[in-house]
Each structure stands twice: as structure tokens, then as C-alpha cells.
Amino acid sequence: MIRDKFRSLLLLSLLLCLMPGIMAANQSFEARFESIVDQLNQGSKEEFIEALDIDAILRRAFDGLDLDPAVRSRFANNVIRGKKNIVSSFVRRTPEGSYTKLLNVRVNGDKATALLRYDLGRIGYGYHQYELVRDDEGNIRIVDWLDYTAGRTYSDMLRQSVVTYDPTESSVRGLVKSYDGSDESYARLAELMQAVRDKDFNSYHRIEPSLDRRLKHSLFMHLLNCDVGKMSRDQNRYNDAYRALENNFGDNPALALMLMNYRLSKGDFDDLGQSLRQLQQAFGVRDAAVLLLMSRAALGARHTDDAAVLADEAISIEPQLESSYWAAINAHVLLQHYSFAVSTARSLEDQFDKSLERELFEKSGRYANFVKSPQYEQWQAEKE
């Protein structure tokens, strides 16, 4: 008994000694990325660029590919030279008041992931989950990231790009990580990638049906078909590609943002709401922007009570997100909860130091009953 107690006390002492180190590791990952995000919001990309481990990203991109050495070297040099432009592709000029937000950091020893949300203006929101490691000198480096707007990692996008740049029977081997095909199937895949490179969409759609069945049904091919649908600007092909992606991989939360516009275009608000809930669960954090999108999906599906609850929650989580206030106002107006609508409008004015003029509501038909309500009249009278 005494020995067991002694062992327990020893373990507890050891744990208490380790805790400061564990907490310091957690804080340093989080502190580093908080600093990067602060700099991005001030217009500086230098800290982000400094943290990028391009060599590690390229090793992942090239892993398993049989590339011509000259092609490999030229492609790598182009990526390295364009290092400063990488961040510019997702940190763009956005509306006044928009910002990048660090949503969470998950630490596992000397590795971690950091989830960032980018405001892309009219396009909506982009999410990147960064994979972080600590190098031999203790510096925190970015070695890859999952881009939720593309449904794949940055290294996988580079992998596809380098093979598209020089599509040969040798280079396409290893392109699809989960696929091991025959010589003939790789020859067809090389022809297909040549058509992508040359933007020869007629040849692409002639070759694609003849591919090996396992390859045709892979996530890689579904994503490639979506890419080609966008590149060709063929609306029918685009819809077919996204319909197939939804039917076969629609429950994959990493594809929720990719599928969002397609689901919106066909008015599939219930499925959109479900995929956004899956996305929220995958994030491991309640994100106000996703709640806002869920609120809009619920409103589209005529689940107005849910829309109001979700928009109100978005405001409580992140008061700086102005769009959430309008989503809440619209939902409460539809529910004829005019006191809640006025209360939300007042909160919006206070948070953003602005005055909502009468004309803003009175010129829109959606607020016709709201502007006739006693609650609205009292609010306007108090403003005069």
C-alpha cells in the first residue's frame, strides 16, 4: 500500500514537472500563429513567408513521382521564386473591416495544426488547416496545409501541377496515391493529363470514359473533372462533375466549401446545412462564419427558427462579424420577432459605431411589416 502511494506521488511529481514544458510548447505554437495572423491583418506577409518550409512541401509534392530531373529542378525553382506570391493567392484585397482569424491550434508534441479563416470578400470565406512542425533549431515551420476551398492539400495541388507541366507515362505513376494500375491505364492517364495541359477539352472528354474503372471512381479524378469543368466554362460539364462529386464524396467535410456553391445553385439547402454541420465538427470549434452560412442555409430551407438561433449564436461567438447581425435581423423579421430585430440592429450600431438610417429598411420590401411595427417606430423615435 505504501509502495503504491509512493509510486502515485512520484508520477504526480513527474507530471507536475512536465506540465510547464507542455504548456510552453502549446503556447509557443499558438503564440507564433497569433503573431502571423496579427501581421497579416496589418498588411504584412513576412512572418508567414518566413514560416513556410518550401523544401518540405516540395518533398511531399514530389514523393513517389518519377520526374525528369530537369523538370523537377525547374518546377522547384519556380515555386521557390514565387514563395512571396503564395500568401497573396488567399490574402487578397477584401472589404473594409474584414480580417483573417485564427480559429484553433491543436498541439501533439513537436507537431501541431492551426486552422485559419480568410475573408475572401464577395467569394465568401476560405479555410486553411496548416500542418506545423518544430525544426531542429526550435523554429515553427509550415510544412503543408489543407485548403478547404479546393478540397485538397497544397502539396497535392503542386503534385498535380508538376505532372500537368510534363505529363509522361513515367511521371503519372504515383500521381494518384491510392491507385496502382496497368501500363495501359497509365498511358491513358498520361494522354488525359496532356489534354489538361493543352486545354484540349474535347480530347479530355474523349479519353476520360476509357480510363480504368478504379481510377475513374477515385477522388483524384472527381476533383480533376471539377477543375476541367471550371477551366472549360462548360456549365453542363461543370454541373455533371460536381453532381458526381456530391454523389460519391458528399459526406467528406473537406469538400463542403467546394460543394457549397453547387448546392446553392440547385437550391439544396438541407444538404448544404448538413455538410456545413460536418465541416463545423471537423474544425473542432464553433466558427461564427460557418454558423452564419448554416443560418443562411436554414433560411433557404425555410427553417427560420433555426436560422435565427444560428445567427444569434454567431454574434455571441464573434461580435466583430457584421454579416451575422444582418442574418439575425432578417430571420427575426420573418418570424415577426420585431423586438429581437430592433435589439440586434441596436447592437450592430453600437458594435460598428454606425447609424442605420430609415431608408435602409424602408426601401426594401422584405422589411415592409417590420417598419410598420410599434417596436420599429419606437426605435426610430429614440434616434431622433
Task: Outline where the language-model segments fall.
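Surface-exposed, charged secondary-structure patches
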Residues: 26, 71-123, 246-251, 384
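Short beta-strand edge/turn micro-motifs at domain boundaries
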Residues: 123-174
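Alpha-helical segment of the N-proximal tetratricopeptide repeat
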Residues: 180-210, 214, 221-231, 258, ...
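Canonical positions in the second alpha-helix
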Residues: 210-211, 244-245, 278-282, 313-314, ...
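Short coil turns that delineate tetratricopeptide repeat
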Residues: 215-216, 250-251, 284-285, 319, ...
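Alpha-helical adaptor scaffolds
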Residues: 223-231, 253-270, 274-316, 323, ...
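Terminal, low-structured helical/coil segments at or just beyond the last alpha-helical repeat
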Residues: 355-384
